[in-house]
C-alpha cells in the first residue's frame, strides 16, 4: 500500500471506531484477533453511544465522503443485506458536500475548451456554484453564440485517486464477508461492489451522461409528461457537460406545487406512467430519479409536466426481462404464486433445478400477508423487494438491471404518494402492463415481427438458391459422415466381440493347463501346450482391443 492509502485506511478505521461500528463485527472465532485488536485501540472510543446503530452507520458514511455515501445509498436498496432499521437509515443518506473553489472549476472548464478563457465561450459565468454534490459541481452562464442560459457541470478535481483508493478497500472488505457471515457467500458481496464500481465510474464520465440525456430527450420529445433539458454536445467532454438551464418547482416542495395550482392527482399518475413508459416502451430508464433530480414545470399546472435532470445512471431491460417482469407483476396481483415461481425459473433468474413447489410456497409465505392491505396501499417497490429477497434464498443471481429498477420504482412510488396519498399505483399501472403484454403476443405481434424482418429477407432473397444448394450439399456430406461413423462403430463392435471371445478362450486354456500340470503330471507336455495356446489366444484378443 502507498503512504496515501495507509493514511486513508487509518482515517476510515478511526471514523468507523469513533461511531462504534465495531459492533457490526460478528462474535466468531475467526474474528477474535480483530476484536482483540480493537481493544488495543483504546484511544478511539465510541463518541456517539447515545445514537442507534443504523444512524451511526449513516453518519460515518457521510463523514467518509462521496464513495461511501453512494455505496450506502446503493446498499439501502439491497434489504436482504441489512435489517430494516439499518436499511432505512442508509436510504436517508444525502449526496450533499461542501462546494470546491469556483476558480478551480473555471480552470477545468478552460482546460476542457482548449485553454481559451471562459469568456471566449460563455457570458455571465457565475463563479459561485448553483449546486454541489460528491462527484460534480454546477455553475451557471450564458452561451456566447446564442445568449441561452445554461448550466455547466464540472467533475470535482482530484477525485479519481480517492475513489480508486476507497474502492480498493471496499473490495477487501467484500472478500472478508463470506468468511465472517454464515450466509455471506450467497450475498455475493464482491459482485455487489463490482456493480457499484461500474455505476460510479459511469458517473465520472460526463460524455456518457450527455448521451443518456440526449437519448431520454429524444424518447420524450413532444411528450406532455416529461421534459429533459437540451444538451449542447459541442461543449461537452469527459469532465464537463453543458446543458439548458431549467426553472421548475422541486417535486418535494408540495406546498409550492399546491400554491401554483398543480393537479396533484394527475401529476402523481404521470410519474407512474413515465416510469413504465421508459421501462416497457423504450427499454431505457432514468435510474436515479430521487426527488433532488425531479422538478415540475411552472407552466400549465392543470396539465403538469415533470422535468428530469442528472442522467448519469440509466438502466435497460432486454425483451425477455420486460416480459417476465410484466407477467410477474400481473401474476402476483392475481395471487398466482405458482406462475410467479415458474416465471423466475423460466427467465433464468434462479437455477433451472430449483424446486418450483418449494419456491412457490416460500413466495406465498412472504407475499400473502401483503394482501391484507387494501390494493391501493400495496407498494410495487416492496412487492419487488419481497420477490427478489425470497428468490435470493433460492440462489437467484444478482441482476444489476433489476436492482436499478427496484430502486427507481421505490423513488417513483414514494414521490407519487407524497404528492397524492390516495394514489392507486396498481390501478394506474395495470392497464399499461396488460396492454403491453397483449401487444407482445398474438397476430399483431406476429405481423409487426414480419414487418421488422421483411428488409432482411428481401436482402437475402437473391442468395436463397445458393443457400439451399449449400444446405443440401452439407446435408449429403453430413449423411456420408454419419454412415462412415456408423460403419466404424459396427466394425469396433465386431472386433470387441471377437476380442472378448479370444480372451475367454485364452483364460480357459491357461487355467485348464495349470490344473492338469498340478493334478496330472503323467500327461507330460499336454498341459504346457494348453497353457501356451491359451497365452497366444489371450494375446491375440488383447491386440484386438487396441
Curated annotation (Swiss-Prot):
Sites where the protein binds ATP: 130-138, 153
Keyword Nucleotide-binding: yes
Primary role: Is probably a protein kinase regulator of UbiI activity which is involved in aerobic coenzyme Q (ubiquinone) biosynthesis.
Protein name: Probable protein kinase UbiB
Pfam families registered for this protein in UniProt: ABC1 (PF03109)
Compartments (UniProt record): Cell inner membrane
TM annotation in the entry: 501-521, 522-542
Recorded family membership: Belongs to the ABC1 family. UbiB subfamily.
Start and end residues of each Protein kinase domain: 124-502
Catalytic-site annotation from UniProt: 288
Organism: Escherichia fergusonii (strain ATCC 35469 / DSM 13698 / CCUG 18766 / IAM 14443 / JCM 21226 / LMG 7866 / NBRC 102419 / NCTC 12128 / CDC 0568-73)
Top-level taxon of the source organism: Bacteria
Known pathway: Cofactor biosynthesis; ubiquinone biosynthesis [regulation]
Keyword Cytoplasm belongs to the record: no
Biological processes, Gene Ontology terms: regulation of ubiquinone biosynthetic process; ubiquinone biosynthetic process
Major localization listed first in the record, in broad terms: membrane
A single GO cellular-component term on record: plasma membrane
GO molecular function: ATP binding; protein kinase activity
Record membrane topology: Multi-pass membrane protein
Swiss-Prot/TrEMBL keywords: ATP-binding, Cell inner membrane, Cell membrane, Kinase, Membrane, Nucleotide-binding, Transferase, Transmembrane, Transmembrane helix, Ubiquinone biosynthesis
Entry EC no(s): 2.7.-.-
CDD domains per UniProt: UbiB (cd13972)
InterPro entries, A to Z: ABC1_dom, Kinase-like_dom_sf, UbiB, UbiB_bact, UbiB_kinase
Amino acid at each position: 500500500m502507498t503512504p496515501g492509502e495507509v493514511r486513508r485506511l487509518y482515517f476510515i478505521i478511526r471514523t468507523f471506531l469513533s461511531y462504534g461500528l465495531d459492533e457490526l463485527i460478528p462474535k466468531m472465532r475467526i474474528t477474535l484477533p480483530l476484536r482483540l485488536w480493537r481493544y488495543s485501540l483504546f484511544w478511539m472510543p465510541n463518541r456517539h453511544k447515545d445514537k442507534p446503530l443504523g444512524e451511526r452507520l449513516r453518519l460515518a458514511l457521510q463523514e467518509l465522503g462521496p464513495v461511501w455515501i453512494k455505496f450506502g445509498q446503493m446498499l439501502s436498496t439491497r434489504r436482504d443485506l441489512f435489517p430494516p432499521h439499518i436499511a432505512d437509515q442508509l436510504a436517508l443518506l444525502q449526496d450533499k458536500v461542501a462546494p470546491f473553489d469556483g476558480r478551480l472549476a473555471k480552470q477545468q472548464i478552460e482546460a476542457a475548451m482548449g485553454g481559451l478563457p471562459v469568456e471566449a465561450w460563455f457570458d455571465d459565468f457565475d463563479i459561485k456554484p448553483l449546486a454541489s454534490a460528491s462527484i460534480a459541481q454546477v455553475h451557471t452562464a450564458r452561451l456566447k453564440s446564442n445568449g441561452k442560459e445554461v448550466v455547466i457541470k464540472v467533475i470535482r478535481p482530484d477525485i479519481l485517486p480517492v475513489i480508486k483508493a476507497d474502492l480498493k478497500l471496499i473490495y477487501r472488505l467484500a472478500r472478508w464477508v463470506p468468511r465472517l457471515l454464515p450466509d455471506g457467500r450467497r450475498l455475493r458481496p464482491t459482485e455487489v461492489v463490482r456493480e457499484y464500481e461500474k455505476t460510479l465510474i459511469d458517473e465520472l464520465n460526463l460524455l456518457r451522461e450527455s448521451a443518456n440525456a440526449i437519448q431520454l430527450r429524444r424518447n420524450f420529445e413532444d411528450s406532455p409528461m416529461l421534459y429533459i433539458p437540451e444538451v449542447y454536445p459541442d461543449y461537452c467532454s469527459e469532465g464537463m457537460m453543458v446543458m439548458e438551464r431549467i426553472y421548475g418547482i422541486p417535486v418535494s416542495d408540495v406546498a409550492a406545487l399546491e400554491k401554483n395550482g398543480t393537479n396533484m392527482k394527475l401529476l402523481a399518475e404521470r410519474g407512474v406512467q413515465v416510469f413504465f413508459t421508459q421501462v416497457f416502451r423504450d427499454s431505457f430508464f432514468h435510474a436515479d430519479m430521487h426527488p433532488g433530480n425531479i422538478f415540475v414545470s411552472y407552466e400549465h399546472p392543470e396539465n403538469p409536466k415533470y422535468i428530469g435532470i442528472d442522467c448519469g445512471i440509466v438502466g435497460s431491460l432486454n425483451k425477455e426481462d420486460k416480459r417476465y417482469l410484466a407477467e410477474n407483476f400481473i401474476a402476483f396481483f392475481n395471487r398466482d404464486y405458482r406462475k410467479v415461481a415458474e416465471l423466475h425459473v423460466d427467465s433464468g433468474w434462479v437455477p433451472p433445478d430449483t424446486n418450483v413447489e418449494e419456491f412457490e410456497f416460500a413466495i406465498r409465505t412472504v407475499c400473502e400477508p401483503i394482501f391484507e392491505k387494501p390494493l391501493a396501499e400495496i407498494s410495487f417497490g416492496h412487492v419487488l423487494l419481497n420477490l427478489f429477497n425470497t428468490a435470493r434464498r433460492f440462489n437467484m443471481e444478482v441482476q444489476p438491471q433489476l436492482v436499478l429498477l427496484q430502486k427507481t420504482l421505490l423513488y417513483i412510488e414514494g414521490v407519487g404518494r407524497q404528492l397524492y396519498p390516495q394514489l392507486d399505483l396498481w390501478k394506474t399501472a395495470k392497464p399499461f402492463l396488460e396492454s403491453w403484454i397483449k401487444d407482445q403476443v398474438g397476430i399483431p405481434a406476429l405481423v409487426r415481427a414480419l414487418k421488422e424482418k421483411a428488409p432482411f429477407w428481401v436482402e437475402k432473397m437473391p442468395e436463397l438458391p445458393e443457400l439451399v444448394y449449400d444446405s443440401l450439399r452439407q446435408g449429403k456430406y453430413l449423411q456420408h459422415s454419419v454412415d462412415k461413423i456408423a460403419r466404424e462403430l459396427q466394425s469396433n463392435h465386431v472386433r470387441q466381440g471377437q476380442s472378448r471371445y479370444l480372451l475367454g478362450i485364452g483364460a480357459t486354456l491357461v487355467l485348464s493347463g495349470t490344473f492338469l500340470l498340478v493334478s496330472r503330471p503323467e500327461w507330460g507336455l499336454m498341459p504346457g501346450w494348453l497353457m501356451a495356446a491359451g497365452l497366444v489366444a489371450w494375446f491375440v484378443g488383447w491386440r484386438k482391443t487396441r
